[in-house]
Amino acid sequence: MKINFINLQAQYQKYKNEIDEQIKEVLDSSVYIGGKVGELEQNLAKFSGAKHAIACSSGTDALLLAFMALDIKPGDEIITTPFTFIATAEMIAFLGAKPVFVDIDERTYNIDPNLIEAKITLRTKAIVPVSLFGQTADMAAINAIAQKHSLTV
């Protein structure tokens, strides 16, 4: 039996007309950087209430930019979950920092906020929760811990 990891075809079919129209506009304009990308960035910034948004080609690039914006340096520590795509730890290590893994809550598969504080050291700069399977990590608890210890989430 073959079980697909994710059914991209079903997701595509749901928005096919909208996606195809946007792709056609980009191809017709021959503007592949800027144009629609700039429009997307403006819409994302407005939607999120941020001053700026930067579109990235991958989540890996987005993580790298976020860590660089936080001025993560060699020797810094970032708390995250071990139950994530490799890019989370990879980009931490790429900058010479250390991923510090906090175990998951076995009910949600997300990082267990009750275990975070025990892993915080003087070198800890941030907490990177990862929400999985349609369940958001306990952001209220994580943000409270981060605020208490002056960490970025």
Give residue ranges: language-model regions.
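N-terminal "arm"/small-domain region of PLP-dependent enzymes with the aminotransferase-like
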Residues: 1-29
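Short beta-strand segments
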Residues: 4-7, 57, 128
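Generic alpha-helical secondary structure signal
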Residues: 14, 18-22, 35, 39, ...
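Solvent-exposed, non-membrane alpha-helical residues enriched in polar/charged side chains
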Residues: 20, 24, 28, 41-45, ...
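Phosphate-binding glycine-rich loop
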Residues: 29-77, 91-95, 101-103
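PLP-dependent aminotransferase-like
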Residues: 68-153
